Amino acid sequence: MVFSYYLFKPFYSAGWRLLNLLHKRQETVFYCHTPVDLEIWLPIQKYLKPIPIVTDKRETYKFLKGKGFSVRKLPAFPKAVIMCRVSAHKFPSQKVIKIGMMHGAYHFKRRTSAKNYLPFSLYMFSSQMDLDNAVSIGVTCGMVGGYPKLDPYLPTPAIPKRSGAKPKLLFTATYDSSGMSGIARWIDHLHELTDRYEIAVSVHPWTNPEYIQRLRAMQGISFIEDNPLHHIPDADVCIVDTSSIIAEICALDKPMISWKIPAARRSVPEVYDIIAGISIQIESFEELAGALDLALAKPAALAQERQQANKVFFDKLDGKAGERVARHIIDLLPENKL
């Protein structure tokens, strides 16, 4: 648990108890850390009574307001909170019921300590294998919920191609400070591809701001500021490293080219093995042209391997994960039933 939990807990807990004496706590809120959390939440919210959104992030507050959502700033003193994080310290009282779920599919980086799950009454994972991994490190509050973020994209939509259109490439990268990113292998070379390909780029929000500034300023590419999931269905090939977006690309059955990334502190060996099996792996940018030719010529070459990986990453890919997660929430908090 982070230090702020212990620092603020006495004051927050006292405030919660006082407010509960004055007016019994009955509200459930959704804590939205980033706009990505909203993408996960909306397919769940439609199966529940309206649940207020709260945040402590200025940019997230501005984003939600700009999209027309009603949102409040922390602190909040609810009966229960739902979140897509392991951020129980934002509500530092044992009296607040806490429900959590993953903000990315599966555990593409080594999981946080089981101690950080202890405040949760329920934490939902994207697949049985993901849950089994959590149990193996000592998590005791887990259930399988699925991955609601994908619901609006299932079944996979068919995107018609414009006649004469260039093939579309989607470059993705996790944050470089993780030691698991491939961004340094391609950022200086994107301009070499723009004549032949349409290029979109998405990077983790924690990526070095200098990289992000450079990408925003580049001519001939589309830098994705929001959810990259919108851009996967019409991509012809996705270029990846070790980010959990790989699971989303896999679910939508798109061919991938991956960089061979050395092991780092938070690497998960079995995930590296899966990535190697579902993608064309390369070491350097010089190998990319040949890999692209192969992926474009035979997009279904690793389709069976992607289907097998989906069984690891996800519970079911039926577009109903939001409904299943909502049922788990209702079992714990029946007052939120529609």
Say what each PLM segment does.
Residues 2-17, 119-181, 203-207, 297, ...:
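A nucleotide-sugar donor-handling region in carbohydrate enzymes
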Residues 16-21, 25-155, 179-180:
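Active-site and donor-binding regions of nucleotide-sugar-utilizing enzymes
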Residues 36-48, 145-214, 280-282, 317-323:
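Conserved catalytic-core segment of nucleotide-activated headgroup transferases in glycan assembly
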Residues 93-102, 226-268:
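A donor-sugar binding/catalytic signature common to diverse glycosyltransferases
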Residues 129-132, 209-211, 265-269:
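Short, glycine/polar-rich helix-capping loops at beta-to-alpha or helix-loop-helix junctions
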Residues 136, 141, 245-313:
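Catalytic binding pocket for nucleotide-activated donors in carbohydrate/polymer assembly enzymes
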Residues 212-226:
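Nucleotide-activated donor-binding/catalytic signature segment of Leloir-type glycosyltransferases, i.e.
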Residues 317-338:
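C-terminal alpha-helical cap of glycosyltransferases
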